Amino acid sequence: MKSRSESKNCRLAQASRVAVNKVLDKSSARGSRGKKKQDDNCDSAKRDKGVNGKGKQALDARLIDNVLEDRGCGNVDDDEMNDSDWEDCPIPSLDSTVDDNNVDDTRELTIEFDDDVPDAKKQKNAYRATAEDKVRAELVHKVHLLCLLARGRIVDSACNDPLIQAALLSLLPSYLTKVSNLEKVTVKDIAPLLRWVRENFSVSCSPSSEKSFRTSLAFALESRKGTAEELAALAVALLRALKLTTRFVSILDVASLKPGADRNESSGQNRAKMKHGIFRTSTLMVPKQQAISSYPKKSSSHVKNKSPFEKPQLGNPLGSDQVQDNAVNSSCEAGMSIKSDGTRRKGDVEFERQIAMALSATADNQQSSQVNNTKKVREITKISNSSSVSDQVISTAFGSKKVDSPLCWLEVYCNGENMDGKWVHVDAVNGMIDAEQNIEAAAAACKTVLRYVVAFAAGGAKDVTRRYCTKWHTISSKRVSSVWWDMVLAPLVHLESGATHDEDIALRNFNGLNPVSSRASSSSSSFGIRSALEDMELATRALTESLPTNQQAYKSHEIYAIEKWLHKNQILHPKGPVLGFCSGHPVYPRTCVQTLKTKERWLRDGLQLKANEVPSKILKRNSKFKKVKDFEDGDNNIKGGSSCMELYGKWQMEPLCLPPAVNGIVPKNERGQVDVWSEKCLPPGTVHLRFPRIFAVAKRFGIDYAPAMVGFEYRSGGATPIFEGIVVCTEFKDTILEAYAEEQEKKEEEERRRNEAQAASRWYQLLSSILTRERLKNRYANNSNDVEAKSLEVNSETVVKAKNVKAPEKQRVAKRGEKSRVRKSRNEDESHEHVFLDEEETFDEETSVKTKRCKCGFSVEVEQM
C-alpha cells in the first residue's frame, strides 16, 4: 500500500514538473503580458482533453491543491490553513485521474490565457475643442493659478505666527536648539530636526473641517497629527523659529491649459484608477541612502549621550521590521509604499507565486516532511509576494492617490554647503533631504504634473520649477505664457528676495511697518548677490538640460532642434555644432533655426533682397489662398506650371533702399500708392500723414501725394487693401497740416451754426404751440362754463322727477336729460366752431349709440352698426 502511494506521488510530481516547465517557457516568450484567468471547472476530464485558448499564462491552482492533499497537507493545523494565502476549493478524487496500472506520462496539461487587450481607439473619446473652449480653459487656468498663489501665501503667513513658533520651540529638546547658534549650517545639522518632526507628528489622510489655515495649523500642533500640507508648514515654522532661512515650496496643480485634458482624465478607466489609487507601474522615489531612517523613540538619558548634530546613518540599510513599518507609514501618510522590480504588475506577481507553489510541491517526495514542506510552501509564497522589496530604493506602488501626492515641502538655505551655499530640499512628510532630483519621478507616479513649483516666503513667491523638473520640454506646452506669468510674479519675487536674505526686513515690509523703498542699499546689495546666484543656477539648469530621447519633443523644444521637425518656413542656417543624435538624426541648437519669409514680407521689416540671391526654399502655394497672396504680394511666381512661393532668410536681406523724393514728387509703386507697412518703408524725404480726408487739402493746393496702404482686410476669401492717410514730401507737411486745421475749424463752425439753427427752429415750434393753446383757452373758456351750469340744472330736474323710478328707469331718464341738453345747445351761436375731443365721447352698449360732445355743450349721436 505504501509503495502504491509512493508511485502515485512520483507520477503526479513528474506530471506537475512537466506542466510547470511548459508554462515557464511560454510565459517567458510572451513576457507575462496577458491577464490571469482562473479556471473554475478544471477537473480531470478537462485535463485529459485540454482546453483551447487564445494564450497561455495562468497556472491551474487545482493541480497544486491535489499535490498538497496527496502529500499530506491536510494534516496542517486549522490556524495555518485559515491564512489569507489559501482558499477553499473542491478537490477531485485521484482515482479518476491516475490509473494504478496504466499511467500515461506523456499527456499534456493545457492552460488557458486571456489575452484580450481593449482597443485603444475605442477607448479614446473624440473631442474637438472650439476657440471659445480654448479661451475659457486658459482663463480657468489663470484664475486657478492665482488662487493657488494666494493659498501658498496664506500658508506662508501662518508659518510666521509667533505663537506657533513658540509652541514648537517649547516641544523641541534643548540639544536640538543649538542649531540656531551655528554660523555654517549643513545638511547633517538639519537631519536631527527632521527626524524629530517625523517621530512626533503623523499624517492624517482626512483634511480638517472648514476652518482657517492658521486654526487648522494650531489644531495639528496640539493633536500632533495633520495633513501633509500642515506638517510641512509646521516644519517651516520650526526652522524659522530656529533662525534658519526657510521657504515653503508647493506644486501648483492647476487645471489643464487644454480644454479636454481634465475631462479625459476623469472619464472611463482613469476615473476608476484614481478612485482606487492603483497605478500600472511604480516609479523610483528616492535612493535609500538618502532616506532618513526612523528608529524607535529612546529615553532622554540615552539620547543625551549622543552628539546633538550626529551625522545620520544614511548608508546603513534598515532592518526588515523597519522596512515594513516604513512601507505602511508611507502608504498611509504620503501615498508611498514598496515597489516591485521593473514594471511588474499584480498579475505577474501572482503568477510567479503560483509557480513557486507548484515547484515547492514537487521539490520533496518524502512523506516524513509533509508539515514542514507545507510551511515551506507558505514561506515561499510570502517571500514571492514581498520579493519586490529592494534594499536600495524606496518607491511608490499600488494604492497611491492623487490627493496624497507630494505637493509641498520646504527649502532650507545651507550656507555651509558648497562655497556660496545652496538651497536644500527637505521633505518632512516622507523624510527626505537633498533629494530634489527625485521629485519629478514622485510626482509622475502620483499622477501630478510638475508644471509650477513655487517657493513662498514672507508674502512673496518665486518660480523654482527648473530646480525640480529635468525635462522642461514635457511641461513647457502645459504652462501659461511666460510674459503673463513673469508679470504676475514680478512684485512677489521682490518680497521673496528680501525674505530669503533678510528675514526681519522682509517681515516688516510684509506687515506694513516699513516700506520697501526705505530698505538700505548696503544691506540689500549682498542679498541681491544671493538671489542672482540662484537665478544663475536655474538658468544653468535650463541650458544644460539633457537631450530628449523622443523625436516629438524636438518640435517645440526651446534649446534643441532636429531638422526633420522644423516648420516649412524654417531652415537651419548655419548648421551649427551637432550636439548629439536622436534615432540617427543630428541635434542642433535652437539658435541655428532661422525663419524664412517672402521678399514682400521682408519689406514690411524694412529689408530688401540682396542681388543675385537664390531662394532658400520654394514651397507650393495653397490654392485656397492663392488669389489673396497674389494680390497681397503683387507677384505670381510660376515654377514648373504650379504657383510657388519663394522664401528667403534674413541673412539674404539688406536694409531697404527706396528712391528719395525729388522736386516735391513722391515715388510711387506700380499701383500709384506707397505701401507703408512700417515707418521704415517710407521713401526718404517723405512723411505719412494719418488724417481722414486730408488728401482734399493736398489736392486743393496742388501738392503731389500718394495714398498710404497700411494693410489688408480679409473677407470671404479675398483681400481688401486698407488705406490710411497720404504720403507727401516733408517740405509740404506744415502747409498741409495748417490748411487741414483751418478746414477742420471751418467745419466745426459750420456744424455749430447748423446745430444752433436747428435748436432755434425747434424752440420756435414749441412756443408757437403754447401760444395757440392759450388763445383757444381764452376764447372758449366762458362758453364752456355756461353750458356746464345749464346742464347741471337740467340734470337736477330730471333727478327730482325720477325719484320713485327703478334703477333701469333712472338710466333712461338720464339719457333723456342728455338729449334735452343737446336740443338746447343747438340754439347757440351758429358761428361757433365745434371741436369734438376723444375724452368727451361716450358709448351706450345697449343701443350701440356713440355720443360726441363739444366744449360748448353741443353733442352729436352716432349709431354704430
Swiss-Prot record:
This protein's GO CC annotations: chloroplast; nucleus
Top-level taxon of origin: Eukaryota
GO BP terms: double-strand break repair via homologous recombination; nucleotide-excision repair; response to UV; UV protection
Subunit description: Interacts with CML19. Calcium is required for this interaction. Binds to RAD23B and PTAC12/HMR/PAP5.
Lineage: Eukaryota, Viridiplantae, Streptophyta, Embryophyta, Tracheophyta
Composition bias type Acidic residues, residue spans: 76-88
Residue span of motif Nuclear localization signal: 34-41
Signal peptide: none
Protein name (database record): DNA repair protein RAD4
Disruption phenotype: Probably lethal.
UniProt keyword terms in alphabetical order: DNA damage, DNA repair, Nucleus
Family, similarity comment: Belongs to the XPC family.
Biological function: Essential protein. May have a role in the nucleotide excision repair (NER) pathway. Promotes UV tolerance via dark repair mechanism (nucleotide excision repair).
Organism: Arabidopsis thaliana (Mouse-ear cress)
Chief location bin: nucleus
GO-annotated molecular function: damaged DNA binding
